[in-house]
Amino acid sequence: MHEVRVLAFQKIYSIDINQSAMDDIFDIFSIEDKGLDIENESIKSFYSSLVNGTFNNLEYIDSLIKDISWNWSLDRMDKVDLAILRMGVYSLKFQNFENSKRALIDEAILIAKKYGSKNSDKFINGILDALLKNMENCIEKK
């Protein structure tokens, strides 16, 4: 599902950068370019969940990023990093994942290494790891 995450990240980035509507969130050409089966319902569902879920919860996601990133305002963050972070936070907070939550962070790091700047992977790892630790601490306190 890594390829689907990459496509979702690209769409989230594109919508943010172009300030465009999400009317056509399902870019068939991109999906076909990746060799993914556009008729596969699980692929469509996963992709739509990532994109729609991120934007439907954007205010909450951004507040979490602001709380964890201390001296970094969202305006100062690289737009690629912000798109990866938003999708990563959505995945950690809202998706049931078959593997560990750490695997979600690893996915975000892989995307950052390919599409981000020199230190994007470290920046994203730090923020998502801090969020995961906060989540684990909240669970332990209950």
Swiss-Prot record:
NCBIfam families in the cross-refs? nusB
InterPro entries associated with the record: NusB-like_sf (IPR035926), NusB_fam (IPR011605), NusB_RsmB_TIM44 (IPR006027)
Alphabetized PANTHER family for the sequence: ANTITERMINATION NUSB DOMAIN-CONTAINING PROTEIN (PTHR11078:SF3), N UTILIZATION SUBSTANCE PROTEIN B-RELATED (PTHR11078)
Task: Report which residue ranges the record marks as coiled coil.
Answer: none
Alphabetized GO MF terms: RNA binding
Q: Which UniProt keywords apply?
A: RNA-binding, Transcription, Transcription antitermination, Transcription regulation
Pfam families in the cross-refs: NusB
Annotated GO CC locations: cytosol
- Keyword Glycoprotein assigned to the entry: answer is no
Name-wise, this protein is Transcription antitermination protein NusB
